[in-house]
């Protein structure tokens, strides 16, 4: 499934393009089977390694709760726009709005 978050091959956070860095896919919702749901509904994005896992507490989404919550809220809004007939909370079991 294509991403409903960003389809350009660049980091969603810093917009560094793929030819300048190695991009990684980040499933925005994870745990308890949510990775598969993220992939199924396109709730994933490209991130550079710094913003994904190696940037530490200040910048990496896996360590920065504020950034994680911001991405989750953005993804839920996009989900509601792309899938108006589906209930996000029923599917993912969480609400970020």
Question: What are the language-model segments listed below?
Answer:
Residues 17-19, 59, 84:
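Short, solvent-exposed coil/turn linker segments
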Residues 72-97:
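Short flanking/linker segments adjacent to small metal-binding domains or redox-active Cys/His motifs
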Residues 23-31, 48-55:
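Histidine-centered catalytic micro-motifs
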Residues 29-44:
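Short linker/helix segments within small regulatory modules
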Residues 21-24, 43-47, 75:
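Amphipathic alpha-helical interface surfaces
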Residues 44-69:
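Short Cys/His-centered divalent metal-binding micro-motifs
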Residues 1-24:
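Short cysteine-rich loop/turn motifs with clustered Cys
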């Amino acid at each position: 499934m294509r991403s409903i978050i960003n389809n350009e091959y660049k980091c969603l956070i810093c917009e560094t393009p793929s030819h300048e860095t190695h991009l990684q896919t980040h499933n925005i919702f994870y745990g308890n089977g949510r990775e598969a749901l993220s992939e199924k509904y396109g709730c994933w994005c490209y991130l550079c390694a710094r913003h994904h896992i190696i940037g530490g507490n200040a910048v990496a989404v896996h360590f920065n709760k504020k950034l994680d919550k911001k991405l989750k809220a953005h993804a839920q809004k996009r989900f509601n726009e792309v899938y108006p007939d589906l209930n996000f909370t029923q599917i993912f079991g969480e609400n970020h709005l």
